[in-house]
Amino acid sequence: MAILRASEIREMSASELNDKLVEIKKELMKENSNKATGGAPSNPGKVKELKRTVARIKTIMNEKK
């Protein structure tokens, strides 16, 4: 998952934003379950970045309303 910048997110349509949000939430859930079962994360900063990306997408979706 590449880092999504706010400018890239703003260029997406509403349906693309919803699809991307679902995709990122699934990835975040997978990382959290891996952490909960005692596994070591492949990239420790990934969870933080995924959470920030979800927040960015939700913020921009709210701005477009």
From Swiss-Prot:
Coiled coil: none annotated. Keywords: Ribonucleoprotein, Ribosomal protein. The keyword Transferase does not apply. GO terms for biological process: translation. One of its GO terms (cellular component) is ribonucleoprotein complex. The keyword Glycoprotein does not apply. SUPFAM superfamilies: Ribosomal protein L29 (L29p). GO terms for molecular function: structural constituent of ribosome. Belongs to the universal ribosomal protein uL29 family. This is Large ribosomal subunit protein uL29. It comes from Methanococcus aeolicus (strain ATCC BAA-1280 / DSM 17508 / OCM 812 / Nankai-3). The lineage of its organism: Archaea, Methanobacteriati, Methanobacteriota, Methanomada group, Methanococci. The gene is rpl29.
